Structure formats: structure tokens, C-alpha cells
Amino acid sequence: MNKFIEIFTGLERAHGCTYVEKKNVDGTKVKGQSFVKRQHVTTELWSNHLKGIEPSLGIIPINEENKCRWGCIDIDSYAGFNHKKLINQITKLKLPLVTTRSKSGGAHIFLFTTVPVDAELIRKKLISIGSILGFGSSEVFPKQIELKSKDDTGNFHNLP
């Protein structure tokens, strides 16, 4: 669990929660309810997430210093997405990315760093990579390059 927490570190003062209403086995998008909680991310939240206990945990990748240790390209697809083709393309291009299946049947393409980097840099890199892979219109996390105030939380991404 500690390694998972380390690689998905982000904003500490808030997190996302998602309750899944329906899981479809045919690859269609899963409906759910998501919202931000302005509470610290606790060890219990991490543990429950890894045990599959709802709500699933969402982490805001941009931290209080506008830095990130990870970012994600969120490819929405509702059926028939070819994950193997995407992974083969990433491998061929020798990109340092990790791909997971999303709840919608699409993909989450993660980029991790060993040290915190400016949110603007990781966002620009992921937008560029998304375009190279043919997914230039996909959502990219972090969505912000900076938090505008102490009350700003940015957008969260549901963890795998």
C-alpha cells in the first residue's frame, strides 16, 4: 500500500469520492456519483480503496506547490476499445507510460515521475503524447497548471 500511496501522491487537503451505481459487463460506460471532499486523504481511505470498499478514491494530482508526481490521459470509450493495440503502440514508441482499463472500457495512460515537477510541464507533455498516440482530444490530468487559492482543489482522477 505504501508504494501505491507514494506513486499517486497529490493534494493532501481534499480528495475525490466515487460511488458506482451500475457495472456493465458489455463495456458500456458505468454510471456513478462523484464529488470532492475537502478532507485530508487518510490511510483508511487508501486502504479501503485498495480493498474495493466504496467510495473509490480519487486523487487530485496537483499539490499545494503546483507540482505533480503523476499525470494521466483519460481515454473515454464505451465499447470495443483495443487496449493491446494501444499498449503495443506505447511500447513501440518506448514511452514511459503505464496503461490501465478505465471503468468506461477505455484507458487511463499514466506518466509517473521520481520527483515533483511543475503541473504545467506534465500537462503539456501528456497533451503532446496524447496527440502522438491519436487521442489529442482526450482529457488530461492534472487539468490545472496551478491552484488559484488555498480553497482551490483542482480536479481529481479516480485511481485504479
Segments (PLM) and residue ranges:
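DNA replication initiation on ssDNA origins
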Residues: 1-70, 79-88, 142, 155-156
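Broad hydrophobic/π-residue packing in well-ordered secondary structure
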Residues: 14, 107-113
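Acidic surface patches and DE-rich sequence motifs
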Residues: 24, 102, 151
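DNA replication initiation modules
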Residues: 54-87, 92, 113-160
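Residue-level detector of anion-binding/catalytic polar loops
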Residues: 96
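Short, conserved phosphate-binding/catalytic loop or strand-edge motifs used
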Residues: 99-108
